[in-house]
């Protein structure tokens, strides 16, 4: 599908035409402390696709400047997710590899009188910063000598002080209308081992300082980030200029991708996992890429969805079901269409020979003959969906089976229901039907029309299977729930597990195999599925519930 809009693409075209840059270089800079989600996919896909469109390249840089909660587990997961989406970064960098360079640039700022060591606590720094309508106050430490600042900063590096005891701040303007320019902290003390550097460092650069320097070191031309960094751009440019970086990158902000009935906050996702509301980060109800993969979404569907939503400077909300449409569009001609019965009701064909099973020809995808055919079993005992039978036909619109009525079994014969068997509670547990041998599918029979077509599986050859059906994990905030936590908005019916059957052709199914189960929806074989216990996850229904 066609891309809607992308204002950064227009900027890149102009920069190349006017000679401001010779080659487009972008980067994706995740912090390795969480799993990537669909929101990150917007940044990844646009970083790579835009650079590729102009013959440039993209780097992956791990922004590992905060040692708390960072680790190799997330590094590996992020690399795997990017490759799964279909991209290979030209280089894989780590922000921590630039610690020495960044330290030296901070020393340069001190020598230029543009940075100082401060003794104020974090709370005091906040209080001194002022408000949007009131200027900040200068720290008592702001006018320390260059010599003293150099000495104290070295002592900070040497581990002489405890966590939070001192910071290094840029010396800009405490009266600046942009609060970010009011002497921001650029180094803090953290006696926490780093996942790559170990205990070599106990001072770590802040994001606003590290990020522009990393971009400059790597030769990034267009540094794309989300819209909340819009008022940080002036600081980004200040650090690049005052640190005398030989390459000058530029920052561009775009609106976040927000989806209905979806939370993407790292804190919220971690809470869902840690408190057991989901089975893990790859629970198919989660918005993480590993979860979407497990649920059955493909890289192609996600790429098409992201590119279609485009980039703008406005935060917007997209209906989460839009993603389903791209999966349907991609899979409708390439997914095979076996039969699965999720909520089985037993059918006995009274006039079919006991102990006999015949095999009928069935198309793998009636819209794509190139996918060929398969054999399906038909016999005396069958399963159909409970929802496909009602004792008394309610109206002429009912196009399924009812008592004394006739339907076609897909790829097989007409059957007529003659009687039902009920349990002690009055529930129907078995149908007794007859079939008409003259009505075999493909025979050209036109003697009468059935009351619709339904699917089935043959009992003796059918394979038991578990079907996981998913709905939104969390509901959007409403007027009634606006004062409630997101936990209170969780959907108690977000996961429904059904026990049913699939046809025998699925005996060799493997994790991530995708199917369109006829009349049921698009499904994917779960990673925990085995030959003895088949498990299928519903990726999306056959049709969208909105349009």
What spans do the regions from the language model cover?
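N-terminal catalytic cores of NTP/NDP-binding nucleotidyl/phosphoryl-transfer enzymes
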Residues: 4-13, 17-79, 193-226
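Secondary-structure transition/capping motifs at alpha-helix termini
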Residues: 17-20, 49-57, 81-91, 216, ...
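Conserved short loop/turn motifs at secondary-structure junctions
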Residues: 29-33, 61-69, 91-100, 123, ...
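Active-site cores that bind ATP or allylic diphosphates and position pyrophosphate for catalysis
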Residues: 64-66, 72, 94, 108-269, ...
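A glycine-rich helix N-cap at a beta->alpha junction
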Residues: 74-100, 105-106, 113-116
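Long, charged, mostly alpha-helical binding arms that flank functional sites
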Residues: 247-326
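Substrate/cofactor-recognition hotspot
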Residues: 305-547
């Amino acid at each position: 599908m066609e891309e809607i809009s992308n204002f950064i693409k227009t900027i890149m075209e102009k920069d190349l035409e006017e000679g401001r840059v010779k080659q487009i270089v972008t980067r994706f800079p995740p912090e390795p402390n969480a799993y990537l989600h669909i929101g990150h996919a917007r940044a990844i896909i646009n970083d790579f696709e835009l650079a590729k469109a102009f013959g440039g390249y993209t780097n992956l840089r791990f922004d590992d400047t905060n040692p708390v909660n960072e680790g190799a587990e997330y590094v590996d997961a992020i690399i795997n997710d990017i490759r799964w989406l279909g991209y290979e970064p030209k280089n894989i960098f780590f922000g921590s590899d630039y610690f020495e360079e960044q330290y030296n640039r901070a020393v340069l700022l001190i020598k230029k009188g543009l940075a100082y060591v401060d003794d104020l606590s974090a709370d005091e720094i906040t209080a001194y910063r002022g408000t949007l309508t009131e200027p900040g106050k200068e720290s008592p430490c702001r006018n320390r000598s260059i010599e003293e600042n150099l000495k104290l900063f070295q002592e900070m590096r040497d581990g002489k002080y405890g966590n939070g005891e001192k910071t290094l701040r840029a010396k800009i303007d405490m009266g600046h209308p942009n609060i970010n320019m009011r002497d921001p902290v650029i180094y803090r003390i953290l006696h926490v081992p780093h996942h790559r550097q170990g205990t070599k460092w106990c001072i770590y650069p802040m994001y606003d300082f590290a990020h522009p320097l990393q971009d400059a070191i790597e030769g990034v031309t267009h540094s794309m980030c989300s819209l909340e960094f819009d008022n940080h751009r002036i600081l980004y440019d200040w650090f690049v200029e005052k640190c005398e970086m030989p390459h000058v990158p530029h920052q561009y902000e775009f609106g976040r991708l927000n989806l209905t009935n979806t939370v993407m906050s790292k804190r919220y996702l971690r809470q869902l996992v840690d408190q057991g509301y989901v089975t893990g980060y790859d629970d198919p109800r989660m918005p993480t890429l590993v979860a979407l993969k497990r649920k059955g979404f493909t890289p192609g569907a996600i790429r098409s969805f992201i590119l279609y939503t485009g980039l703008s400077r406005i935060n917007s909300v997209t209906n989460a079901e839009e993603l389903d449409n791209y999966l349907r569009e991609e899979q409708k001609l390439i997914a095979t269409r076996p039969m699965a019965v999720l909520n089985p009701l037993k059918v006995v064909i009274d006039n079919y020979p006991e102990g006999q099973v015949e095999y009928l020809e069935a198309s793998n995808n009636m819209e794509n003959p190139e996918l060929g055919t398969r054999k399906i079993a038909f016999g005396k005992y069958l399963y159909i969906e409970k929802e496909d039978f009602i004792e008394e036909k309610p109206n002429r619109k009912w196009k399924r089976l009812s008592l004394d009525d006739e339907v076609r079994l897909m790829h097989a014969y007409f059957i007529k229901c003659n009687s039902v068997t009920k349990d002690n509670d009055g529930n129907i547990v078995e149908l007794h039907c007859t079939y008409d041998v003259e009505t075999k599918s493909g025979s050209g029979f036109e003697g009468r029309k059935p009351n619709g077509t339904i699917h089935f599986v043959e009992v003796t050859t059918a394979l038991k299977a578990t079907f996981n059906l998913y709905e939104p994990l969390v509901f959007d905030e409403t007027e009634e729930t606006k004062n409630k936590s997101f936990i209170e908005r969780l959907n108690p019916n977000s996961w429904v597990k059904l026990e049913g059957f699939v046809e025998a052709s699925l005996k060799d199914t493997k994790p991530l195999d995708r199917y369109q189960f006829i009349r049921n929806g698009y499904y994917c074989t779960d990673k925990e599925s085995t030959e003895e216990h088949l498990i299928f996850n519903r990726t999306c229904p056959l049709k969208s519930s909105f349009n």
